[in-house]
Amino acid sequence: MKKRIKELTDLLNRYRYDYYTKDAPSVSDSDYDKLYRELVTLEQSYPEYVLQDSPTQQVGGTILKGFEKYRHQYPLFSLQDAFSREELDAFDKRVKAEFPNATYLAELKIDGLSISLSYENGFLQVGATRGDGNIGENITENIKKIKDIPHQLSEPLTITVRGEAYMSRQSFKAINEARQENGETEFANPRNAAAGTLRQLDTAVVAKRQLATFLYQEASPTARNQQNEVLAELADLGFSVNPYYQLTSSMDEIWDFIKTIEAKRDQLAYDIDGVVIKVNSLAMQEELGFTVKAPRWAIAYKFPAEEKEAEILSVDWTVGRTGVVTPTANLTPVQLAGTTVSRATLHNVDYIAEKDIRIGDTVIVYKAGDIIPAVLNVVMSKRNQQEVMLIPKLCPSCGSELVHFEDEVALRCINPLCPSLIQRSLEHFASRDAMNITGLGPAIVEKLFLAGFVHDVADIYQLTKENFMQLDGIKEKSADKLLAAIEASKSNSAEKLLFGLGIRHIGSKVSRLILEVYGDISALLTAKEEEIARIDGLGSTIAQSLTQYFEQKTAAILVDELKTAGVNMHYSGQKVNSDAALFGLTVVLTGKLNQLNRNEAKDKLEALGAKVTGSVSKKTDLVIAGSDAGSKLEKAKSLGIRIEDEDWLRQL
């Protein structure tokens, strides 16, 4: 189970990167959801194997170059997904267990891009993207070009609101027609078009593309008591609010609303991919709280995927940076969710074997939420027995023999000198989440590798202007920019370097957790496995992988070469203080705080070494209870958990 959890974590994180960061989804929503739900089930059964970089512990995407970073005062969370009436009933049961009289507000789930708008004294100050939920991109100038976003509110309020920016189907059609006439690549769907538009550096382009918005939340403290009152206030302030919402008291009413909306979905002027159900009482919302990733007071019902038939013409096999060989099917073109689809993932050889997929087969292709599709299964009634599937025995890149380990689902090339493996490793090292070497993408990495200028990541820091000038298509100005980006990467905080090394199981968040404790890459050369395993959020698998990597002589040589080249080895963030007053404690906040707001209290607790969670359990060490604390306080008492008040926290 441990290995399957790791496989799912790695796969889903790659899909998340493609979806949130590149705005180029590589798997359908429905397929992603199926894998995600499998991971959730396994993690619930084996909580000791949950990895720090698991997508169940994360929110959103990563930060793109070109706009300033913006730290959200109020974090943006994702929503728990539901795909059936039974899952909605289970959500209702959990809520009603604490609040028997709870009512719900059902709203449309707009398929766009999450935005946050901050106003001071009624004037728009900042418009930002979600980013990773804590840090987004400041896109204020582009936000100001969206006609239905007020620059000044009808009242002089200081307020932060949330919503969705989207592109109407009519605008999307017009833009793609124009792009086709100009010989430009068409957008895959309205969501991608909206995302690309908001990241435009030319604000005139943003204005021309006619984005629109629906606002649905006050993130800052509000005087309203109910979610439907929040929507009414947002409309009064001049924001666009979606007119399709319904106050309900039962799941029967919600299910009727879902079916009504699903029936008229195609008649709407914009794309939706589901219905969001929220506890209407804001006081109940606060008491229910959050998981690491999502609020406990809301759930998103997602519509079933659209399905079409297509024929598999051929299969491409590509090698990733860890040696995993991934199959992609080339299909007869088919119209699916408004776009032409000609490629779909086949995941791995085990998936192909399980579904008995062959070249020449007619298959069911599905795509939820306008995302690039995957193959669901084979239409066996259309098979004529002439179909074949040739599973490669040799690496498509280097020609060495592929292996299929018993505990893995994929074929793997284990040749350390495989050109594709080396190139993917170099690309990973230069990528945004790693060393963020702007401009050093796959095309240039390939040219550098084929020219013999780079063989490992340390070689990047030995490149000269002359090296770049020898490459086809690289002019002096481009060479100067690349060298400047390489030089700038030397000053990155060490967790980016650790992630960039591409060690198995060591994601970006895990890298930060490790460096928060060790502070320096060099210290990892002698770190003990049992010490690493004790770091909160890690475990034996990560610890073993890290120590095995740094026990290699080649790792010590590589670190020395990078250090000699001037690459920073130190962690620039705040190191964990094991002497902090609440170090290692799991703490829950409940009730109304009078002096501190929730974020201030959470920040203080984390600064004192605590891990703040949203629910009380046997693993909880401490509960900070404000006034009007409800069921969480009672549960803490029943479990004999230590309870303190706000004054106690303020005095620490």
UniProtKB/Swiss-Prot annotation:
GO CC annotation: cytosol
GO BP annotation list: DNA repair; DNA replication
Active site, UniProt feature: 109
EC number: 6.5.1.2
Cofactor(s) of this protein: Mg(2+); Mn(2+)
UniProt-recorded Gene Ontology molecular function terms: DNA binding; DNA ligase (NAD+) activity; metal ion binding
Top enzyme class: ligase
Limits of the BRCT domain: 577-652
Pfam families: BRCT, DNA_ligase_aden, DNA_ligase_OB, DNA_ligase_ZBD, HHH_2, HHH_5
Residue sites binding NAD(+) per the record: 29-33, 78-79, 107, 130, 164, 278, 302
Keywords: DNA damage, DNA repair, DNA replication, Ligase, Magnesium, Manganese, Metal-binding, NAD, Zinc
InterPro entries recorded: BRCT_dom (IPR001357), BRCT_dom_sf (IPR036420), DisA/LigA_HHH (IPR041663), DNA_ligase (IPR001679), DNA_ligase_AS (IPR018239), DNA_ligase_CS (IPR033136), DNAligase_adenylation (IPR013839), DNAligase_N (IPR013840)
Record SUPFAM superfamilies: BRCT domain (SSF52113), DNA ligase/mRNA capping enzyme, catalytic domain (SSF56091), Nucleic acid-binding proteins (SSF50249), RuvA domain 2-like (SSF47781)
Catalytic activity: NAD(+) + (deoxyribonucleotide)n-3'-hydroxyl + 5'-phospho-(deoxyribonucleotide)m = (deoxyribonucleotide)n+m + AMP + beta-nicotinamide D-nucleotide
PROSITE patterns given in the database record: BRCT (PS50172), DNA_LIGASE_N1 (PS01055), DNA_LIGASE_N2 (PS01056)
Domain of life: Bacteria
Binding residues annotated for Zn(2+), in chain numbering: 395, 398, 413, 418
Record function comment: DNA ligase that catalyzes the formation of phosphodiester linkages between 5'-phosphoryl and 3'-hydroxyl groups in double-stranded DNA using NAD as a coenzyme and as the energy source for the reaction. It is essential for DNA replication and repair of damaged DNA.
Family: Belongs to the NAD-dependent DNA ligase family. LigA subfamily.
Protein name as it appears in the record: DNA ligase
Name of the encoding gene: ligA
